[in-house]
Amino acid sequence: MAKNILLLNGPNLNMLGSREPEVYGSATLADVERAATEQASQAGAKLTAFQSNHEGVLIDRIQAAKKEGVDAIIINPGGLTHSSVSLRDALASVALPFVEVHVSNIHQREAFRHHSYLSGIAVGVICGLGIDGYTAAISFALKKL
């Protein structure tokens, strides 16, 4: 059976390409989603991409994932990385393997960005590879999860 991957992007990631391009690059979220969908499709997998600026909407999407037959989640939680216990709890409650992705290297940035509420329960964490981090996460999910 084909793998089913859910790609989640949190607050402000809809601004990729225009928000601080010196930090996040010039690729847009549409570029990321298009490349991710194509990568999964070429491997015979299904990838569904979803972005929201709202914590509760992301939690609802995570909770629905198990019922939808999602096999793995790739999530860039944006700023919720450093503040959302609720997002962590939602991911823990569905017990689906997930990879945390960050476009920038959060450990080279402001001190408040160094802590992630999600990393401790993630299968893996990828940061600082630009949008190539998504490619790496999808590749890992397809091979290992």
Swiss-Prot record:
<comment type="function">
    <text>Catalyzes a trans-dehydration via an enolate intermediate.</text>
</comment>
<dbReference type="GO" id="GO:0009073">
    <property type="term" value="P:aromatic amino acid family biosynthetic process"/>
</dbReference>
<feature type="active site" description="Proton acceptor">
    <location>
        <position position="24"/>
    </location>
</feature>
<keyword id="KW-0028">Amino-acid biosynthesis</keyword>
<dbReference type="GO" id="GO:0003855">
    <property type="term" value="F:3-dehydroquinate dehydratase activity"/>
</dbReference>
<dbReference type="InterPro" id="IPR018509">
    <property type="entry name" value="DHquinase_II_CS"/>
</dbReference>
<comment type="similarity">
    <text>Belongs to the type-II 3-dehydroquinase family.</text>
</comment>
<feature type="binding site">
    <location>
        <begin position="103"/>
        <end position="104"/>
    </location>
    <ligand>
        <name>substrate</name>
    </ligand>
</feature>
<comment type="subunit">
    <text>Homododecamer.</text>
</comment>
<dbReference type="GO" id="GO:0009423">
    <property type="term" value="P:chorismate biosynthetic process"/>
</dbReference>
<dbReference type="InterPro" id="IPR001874">
    <property type="entry name" value="DHquinase_II"/>
</dbReference>
<dbReference type="GO" id="GO:0008652">
    <property type="term" value="P:amino acid biosynthetic process"/>
</dbReference>
<dbReference type="GO" id="GO:0019631">
    <property type="term" value="P:quinate catabolic process"/>
</dbReference>
<protein>
    <recommendedName>
        <fullName>3-dehydroquinate dehydratase</fullName>
        <ecNumber>4.2.1.10</ecNumber>
    </recommendedName>
</protein>
<dbReference type="Pfam" id="PF01220">
    <property type="entry name" value="DHquinase_II"/>
</dbReference>
<comment type="pathway">
    <text>Metabolic intermediate biosynthesis; chorismate biosynthesis; chorismate from D-erythrose 4-phosphate and phosphoenolpyruvate: step 3/7.</text>
</comment>
<feature type="active site" description="Proton donor">
    <location>
        <position position="102"/>
    </location>
</feature>
<feature type="binding site">
    <location>
        <position position="113"/>
    </location>
    <ligand>
        <name>substrate</name>
    </ligand>
</feature>
<dbReference type="InterPro" id="IPR036441">
    <property type="entry name" value="DHquinase_II_sf"/>
</dbReference>
<feature type="binding site">
    <location>
        <position position="76"/>
    </location>
    <ligand>
        <name>substrate</name>
    </ligand>
</feature>
<feature type="binding site">
    <location>
        <position position="89"/>
    </location>
    <ligand>
        <name>substrate</name>
    </ligand>
</feature>
<keyword id="KW-0057">Aromatic amino acid biosynthesis</keyword>
<feature type="binding site">
    <location>
        <position position="82"/>
    </location>
    <ligand>
        <name>substrate</name>
    </ligand>
</feature>
<keyword id="KW-0456">Lyase</keyword>
<feature type="site" description="Transition state stabilizer">
    <location>
        <position position="19"/>
    </location>
</feature>
